[in-house]
Design a protein with these regions (language model features):
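Low-complexity, Pro/Ser/Thr- and charge-rich linker/hinge segments at domain boundaries
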Residues: 154-190
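Beta-strand-enriched, solvent-exposed domains that form extended recognition/catalytic surfaces
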Residues: 3-166
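Catalytic cores of extracellular degradative/oxidative enzymes
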Residues: 178-180, 187-254
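Alpha-helix capping and helix-coil boundary motifs
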Residues: 17, 172-173, 209-212
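Short amphipathic alpha-helical surface micro-motifs
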Residues: 61-64, 118-121, 172-174, 179-182, ...
Length: 254
């Protein structure tokens, strides 16, 4: 769903439905914009079932929003999603927008929604009409003891808008973080660590952490790791549980 066979010809490409001609031509010629391609074509790993592990660990639920896409969508957008081999596992998109609450305050305020619309995917071409604006997250849940393989998903050009996110494992440096944050366009920006995900207002991050994020994400990764070590998770359930905690920046209650 993300590359052409070497023997594919321009004549064959031009016989494709109109939407795919430009996409296939860019893939063949190597002219797919690098910024777009990094987030539109990703291999998504499996994450453990938060409901199973909340019961097993006797804790509150961790987040199921482990797989950020870095792609924002608007209500009524029609998007194409190309899904590779799912290896028999169910996979879906969840669109996370905003909700209004009054928790802890006398008046209502806005915060990131705890959940959103879910769109189930199949292998091959999926056409989806988005119901509400937000950012897309891939939902890929599996028993990690079955050694699930990553799933490649391609959300092609013209489907949503790339806003990006920072992945500590992949991007590694403050310099790359600053670059990604400066290019982002959505209201919220994601930072994915080993144990923790920040999903904060981009405007506030530009004000307060424009060029440096490593110390903060390392600190919170370490705090979660220490908590899990005290609970015996790594010792008793090694390589079985890998969900993140998910931190948001509500517009009230503080």
């Amino acid at each position: 769903c993300s590359e052409l066979k070497p023997e594919a010809t321009l004549e064959q490409i031009n016989q494709l439905p109109g939407y795919f001609v430009n996409l296939a031509t860019q893939l063949k010629n190597g002219t797919y914009d690098a910024w777009e391609k990094e987030f539109r074509i990703q291999d998504y790993q499996a994450y453990s079932d938060i409901n199973v592990w909340a019961d097993r660990l006797m804790t509150k639920h961790y987040s199921c929003l482990d797989n950020l896409t870095g792609i924002a969508v608007e209500a009524n957008d029609e998007i194409i999603v190309l899904v590779g081999n799912t290896h028999g596992y169910p996979v879906a998109l969840q669109c996370i927008g905003e909700e209004t609450t009054s928790f802890g305050e006398e008046k209502n305020y806005v915060q990131t929604a705890a959940s959103g619309d879910i769109y189930f995917l199949k292998e091959g071409v999926n056409k989806i009409t988005i119901r509400n604006r937000g950012q897309l997250f891939v939902m890929y849940t599996a028993d990690l003891q079955s050694n699930p393989t990553s799933i490649r998903i391609h959300i092609p050009l013209g489907s949503g808008q790339v806003t990006g996110y920072f992945d500590l494992q992949r991007h590694q440096t403050n310099e790359k973080y600053a670059e990604l944050l400066s290019k982002a366009t959505d209201k919220y920006f994601g930072v994915k660590g080993e144990k923790m995900i920040f999903y904060f207002h981009r405007s506030e991050m530009l004000k307060h952490v424009r060029t440096e994020i490593l110390s903060a994400i390392h600190l919170w990764d370490n705090i979660v790791e220490w908590e899990q070590s005290l609970m015996g998770i790594d010792k008793m359930h090694a390589n079985q549980f890998n969900n993140h905690l998910f931190a948001i920046s509500p517009e009230g209650a503080y």
